[in-house]
Amino acid sequence: MTARPVGKLYTPEMLHLATQLAEFPPRPELPLHGEARSATCGSKLALDLEIANDEISASGLLVQACAVGQASAALFAQWIDRRPVSEVTVAGEAVERWLAGDGRLPECIDLAPIAAARDYPGRHGAILLPWRAFSDALCNAHG
């Protein structure tokens, strides 16, 4: 098996996104909480949420992940503000289909900075962390 060039995956744009997580600190005072862990790499993410009028009104993250997972989390956090819950759910499903090779790069959220990670199945779990934590938070709200 030939090693893939690391430079293609870890671009300056991706690494810059990873540093932007500081703009979305944990918010334990928010009413909804979800967690996700990648089975392939052990990365994990905790998401704090508030939903008002069926829209995301506030969020915070605690991310312990590789640069791919951090960049995915930053893209997610930048995108979800004031989005309807249903739109976030549908986008997560589109991301999963795209990673599985069953769909195009989702247009609803700009994942271009991490698109190269699709070729690295070991990173798919890290990319999906925020979406899975979101789903977990919704389940916890109804559980």
Could you describe each region identified by the protein language model?
Residues 7-11, 52-55, 62-63:
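Intrinsically disordered, low-complexity segments enriched in small residues
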Residues 64-70:
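Short, thiol/selenol-centered motifs that function as redox-active sites or metal-ligating centers
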Residues 72-84:
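Alpha-helical support elements that line or immediately flank enzyme active sites
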Residues 41, 66, 126:
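Functionally engaged cysteine thiol sites
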Residues 60, 64, 118:
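Conserved short-loop catalytic and cofactor-binding motifs
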Residues 16-59:
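Structured beta-strand/loop patches that form or line metal/cofactor-binding pockets in enzymes
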Residues 1-23, 83-143:
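C-terminal binding/interaction regions
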